[in-house]
Regions:
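NTP-dependent small-molecule kinase module
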Residues: 2-13, 144-191
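Hydrophobic anchor at the beta1->P-loop junction of P-loop NTPases
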Residues: 20
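The conserved Walker
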Residues: 24
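Conserved lysine of the Walker
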Residues: 28
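Hydrophobic positions on the alpha1 helix immediately C-terminal to the Walker A/P-loop
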Residues: 31
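Active-site signature of alpha/beta-hydrolase-fold catalytic machinery across serine-
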Residues: 34
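Conserved nucleotide-sensing/catalytic segment adjacent to the nucleotide-binding pocket
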Residues: 42-99
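A glycine- and Lys/Arg-enriched "phosphate-lid" helix/loop adjacent to the NTP-binding pocket
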Residues: 101-152, 183
């Protein structure tokens, strides 16, 4: 049976294959990097595997995901419908960032998008955030995507009970819970 843990619950084992789940802009990659450092295991940013130049999907994406999950230890984000089943089937821990959307996630995704655009930050394979006006014209603009998909994890994560009943899931509902989980159960699992 799928085990859903609270931020203070001890982990059943030291995690070796970790997924970070949550809506766009919630802080998945930031948390994945922190988990990677704490556990001293590699983090692979799933967006870097997916996006080719000009924001096109890379044809090698699923081959790269298969190579990633074949490894003994890894941390990555639980994204992309085509990869989610494989990622979940090979993970031993999922950390679900279920943070308040209006108070936490929306400001984060807005500020991140604005910062990346203003600074012209190069993301994956030479891509940069598109002009801000595309918010109004592109249904898949990251801010619009974040808003339109903000509730899907409340269905998708519990549905894992059917396909991945042995997967442990830690559900974190606030930035404070994130910090307490990192300092508590995750740090304890490393000792």
């Amino acid at each position: 049976m799928l085990t859903v843990l609270d931020f203070g619950d001890p982990l059943p084992q030291r995690p070796r294959r970790v997924l970070i789940a949550g809506v766009s802009g919630v802080g998945k990659t930031t948390l994945a990097k922190r988990v990677s450092r704490l556990l001293d295991i590699p983090h692979t940013e799933i967006d870097a595997l997916f996006h080719g130049s000009d924001w096109t999907p890379r044809p090698e994406f699923m081959d790269d995901v298969q190579a990633l999950v074949a490894g003994d230890v890894w941390v990555t984000e639980w994204q992309y419908q085509s990869a989610r089943p494989l990622l979940a089937s090979q993970a031993d821990l999922m950390v679900w960032l279920d943070l308040p959307y209006a108070a936490v996630t929306l400001p984060r995704v807005l500020l991140r998008t604005l910062r990346r655009r203003v600074r012209r930050e190069v993301l994956w394979n030479g891509n940069t955030e598109p002009p801000l006006r595309t918010f109004f014209t592109d249904r898949e603009h990251v801010v619009r995507w974040s808003f339109s998909t903000r509730k899907k994890y409340r269905v998708q994560v519990p549905d894992l009970q059917k396909s991945c009943p042995e997967l442990s899931v830690v559900r974190l509902r606030s930035p404070r819970q994130v910090e307490r989980w990192l300092a508590g159960p995750l740090s304890s699992a490393v000792r």
